[in-house]
Amino acid sequence: MDKPLWKYGHLDSDPKLMIIIFRLVGMTGNAIVFWLLGFSLHRNAFSVYILNLALADFVFLLCHIIDSMLLLLTVFYPNNIFSGYFYTIMTVPYIAGLSMLSAISTELCLSVLCPIWYRCHHPEHTSTVMCAAIWVLPLLVCILNRYFCSFLDINYNNDKQCLASNFFTRAYLMFLFVVLCLSSMALLARLFCGTGQMKLTRLYVTIMLTVLGFLLCGLPFVIYYFLLFNIKDGFCLFDFRFYMSTHVLTAINNCANPIIYFFEGSFRHQLKHQTLKMVLQSVLQDTPEIAENMVEMSRNIPKP
């Protein structure tokens, strides 16, 4: 008989410590990004997405910390029903974050491939409406999935309605992944292989690094929880190792996004003694780096 997941808790204590550290750092970084974009900086189409992505990452990391506490409670209270309920809540910000990243990549791709059409047919509040829809849709998907698959039970159910709900959830995640990959590849092809060389901006580099970070660190979480978790009947030692690996990589991914923003905003920057507000603002400027640096140098030239 396979052991419950928590009985492998005596193994690999170092990854658990790493996960806690990355989650705390990620929560702090995403909270700073959310505060600056929400209350200190002028928002544009892309900053609205990044603000909501930071919020989704923060909520996801917070949910993971609470989930870890609930996992400890199951040791003393095996019949704890809150774990299944909280699993639904934890899934919402993850799907919302993936949706935000797909929307950012798609909108950036459209702005590069069809710049005139994008400027003429992009209403002012499109990003806000899209973000609202992105939050509502994962919430509905997760609630319906838990309703058809026993709302307070995360065990796999062979009911036809549950199977259909699981299939729709996986299809939705696969759709987001395909959109993310295709839009990113199209953007890279236009930037490096298209006719007429385009200047790289900090915004392009930031989005590409964020997408790359998700593909390397965030995708295993999707594979485990939405593909393998319901297929296997129980946990074994290999499952626990893979489980811990997905949590470490996911924590790194959510922690890396704010680091990418601030690193790219300050990298090769001419201004000294920058504030976090100035660094984040430079990331959101959709202007070539050379032109940006020339403007900054002209500002620093002393007037006669």
UniProtKB/Swiss-Prot annotation:
It holds the Pfam family 7tm_1. It is found in: Cell membrane. The chain crosses the membrane at residues 19-39, 46-66, 81-101, 124-144, 173-193, 209-229, 245-265. InterPro entries: GPCR_Rhodpsn (IPR000276), GPCR_Rhodpsn_7TM (IPR017452), MRGPCRA (IPR026233), MRGPCRFAMILY (IPR026234). Expressed in a subset of sensory neurons that includes nociceptors. Expressed in the subclass of non-peptidergic sensory neurons that are IB4(+) and VR1(-). It is a multi-pass membrane protein. GO terms for molecular function: G protein-coupled receptor activity. It comes from the Eukaryota. PROSITE patterns: G_PROTEIN_RECEP_F1_2. Residues 1-18, 67-80, 145-172, 230-244 are extracellular. Residues 40-45, 102-123, 194-208, 266-304 are cytoplasmic. GO terms for cellular component: plasma membrane. Keywords: Cell membrane, G-protein coupled receptor, Membrane, Receptor, Transducer, Transmembrane, Transmembrane helix. Orphan receptor. May be a receptor for RFamide-family neuropeptides such as NPFF and NPAF, which are analgesic in vivo. May regulate nociceptor function and/or development, including the sensation or modulation of pain. Belongs to the G-protein coupled receptor 1 family. Mas subfamily. This is Mas-related G-protein coupled receptor member A5. It comes from Mus musculus.
